[in-house]
Amino acid sequence: MNELNAFNEQRAEIYWWLSSLFAHELTKEQLEQYNSFEIRTFLTNLSETPELTDSISSIVTKLNELQTREDAQLELSADFCEAFLGSDKNSALPYASMYLDKSRLLNAKPAQDMRDLLEKYNITQKAEFNEPADHIAIELDFLGNLIVMTNQQTTEPEFEQFMAAQLQFINEQLLSWAPRFNQLCSERDTFGFYAAVTHFLVTFLELDVKFLAGE
C-alpha cells in the first residue's frame, strides 16, 4: 500500500468515526472507550496536525469533564437529544434539507440528491438507521465509503476521478451547510461536547478540501 492509499484509509476512518457520533447517543461502554489508550492516542495523533489542534483539544477537554460529570452517559444522551432531535427552533437538526432547501422540510431535494448518489455508487444505507438520506451521519458514512472505493481503482485516471468526486461531494453536499449546522449546535449544546465535535467536523472538512485540491 502506498502512502496516499494509507492516508486515504485514515481519512475514511475519521469520517466513519464522526458519522457514528452523529448517528446515535453514546452507550456507557462506548463512552468508557473514549478514555482508553487507543482512542486517546487516536485523538492525540489528530491534534498533531496544527489546523486540528484547537478543535481536538476542545473534544478532549469535554471528554475529561465527562469523567467527573454525574450520570455522564445519561446526561450526554440528553445533550444529544437537545442538540439534534428537537424542533428546528431549539435544535441543530442534522439534515441538509433544513439548511439548503427553501421549504425547510425534511426529505426535500438534498435528500433526493443524496439518494441518487448512494444509488450511483451502489452504496447501501444501513437498514437499522432509518433516517432521510441527507442526515449528516449518512453523508459522512458515504464519504468514508467513497474514499475506500477510490483506493480500489486500478488506473490513475479512475483514481483521480474518484478523488475529484470526493472534493465535489464535500463542497456541494457538506460544506454547503455544515458551518451553519456547527453554529447552531454551538448555540444549543449547553455542555459543549457535540458543539466541539461539529467544530472539529467543519475544521477537518476545510482541511480535507485543501488536500484534495492540492493546496
Swiss-Prot record:
Its main location: cytoplasm. Keywords: Chaperone, Cytoplasm. This is Chaperone protein TorD. It is found in: Cytoplasm. GO terms for cellular component: cytoplasm. It comes from Aliivibrio salmonicida (strain LFI1238). It comes from the Bacteria. The lineage of its organism: Bacteria, Pseudomonadati, Pseudomonadota, Gammaproteobacteria, Vibrionales. Pfam families: Nitrate_red_del. InterPro entries: Chaperone_TorD, DMSO/NO3_reduct_chaperone, HscB_C_sf, TorD-like_sf, TorD/DmsD_chaperones.
